[in-house]
Amino acid sequence: PAVIHAPHHGHGVNPCAPAAYDNRPIKEIEAYVEEAMSQTLEAADVLGAETIVLHAGRYEPGADAAARETFAGFLDRHSDPRFALENLPAVYAGYPLLGNTAKDLTALAGETITHFCLDFPHLACTTNYRGLSFTEELERFDALNVTHHHLSNIRRGSITDEHLELDHPEGGLDLNAVVSRLRRHPAVPTTLEYKEDSPEVYARQARVFAGLWEGHARGGRD
C-alpha cells in the first residue's frame, strides 16, 4: 500500500511551532496548515494509505515546553489513526527539532498516536549530538509500535542528516545494527531516502541494500 508523508516545516507546515522561522502572518500560516493537512488526509484516503508519516517540527531554542504544548494542540485538531510519528535529529542547521528518541516520541504521542516511523540516520545524528549510544537508543524503539522505517546514511560522527547513499565512502551509520533490526522486523516497510530524485540512484541503492541484507544473513558485518 502507499505511504503518505505529511508536509513538514520545509513545506510550511510546522506543527509544534507554526510561526517559528516563518515571516508569514500567523493567520496565513494557520490557513495554510489547515489546507495542507486536509489535502494530506484526502490523498491518504484516495490512495488507500495505511500510514501517514508525521514530523513534530522545529522550534526556537529554549521553547521546548511550548513546542510540546503546541504539538498536542495540533493533534487535537488533526488527529488521524494513520499518523506515524517520526523521530527527528536533535538539531539541523542550528535549530532544534522536537521528538528525537523513543522516549521523546512516546511522550509526544500520548494516547493519540499509536504508530511510529523510525528514521535510522535521524537517530544516529541525535546520538552523535548528545553523546549517546546508537545501539542502546535503537533498542529502545523495540517498545514502540514502529510501522515504518526510513533509511539512508550519514557521515561518521555527523549531527547533520544528508541522506547519503548506503555505500558512501564516508558513511558512518551502524549498518550492522540497522540491518539486524530490519531482519527482526521483516514485515515493517523500509523507505530508502536520498537527495537525488533519480531512478538510477534508487535502483543502485536497492541493490546495495540487498547486498547488506544477504551479507547479514550469512553472518557477515557490512
Regions found by a protein language model. Name each.
Residues 13-115:
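Active-site acidic/histidine proton-transfer and metal-coordination neighborhood
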Residues 15-34, 95-99, 122-187:
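Gly/Pro-rich active-site loop or hairpin
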Residues 54-61, 104-107, 170-180, 200-206:
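A broadly tuned preference for mixed-charge, low-complexity surface segments
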Residues 90, 166-169, 197, 209:
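Short amphipathic alpha-helical "recognition" segments used for binding
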Residues 199-220:
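C-terminal helical cap(s) of enzyme catalytic domains, especially alpha/beta-barrels
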Residues 7-9, 57-59, 88-92, 120-125, ...:
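Active-site beta-loop-alpha junctions enriched in small/polar residues
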Residues 2-6, 52-54, 83-86, 116-119, ...:
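Hydrophobic faces of well-ordered beta-strands that scaffold small-molecule active sites
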Residues 1-11, 38-48, 70-80, 106-113, ...:
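Acidic (Asp/Glu)-rich catalytic clusters
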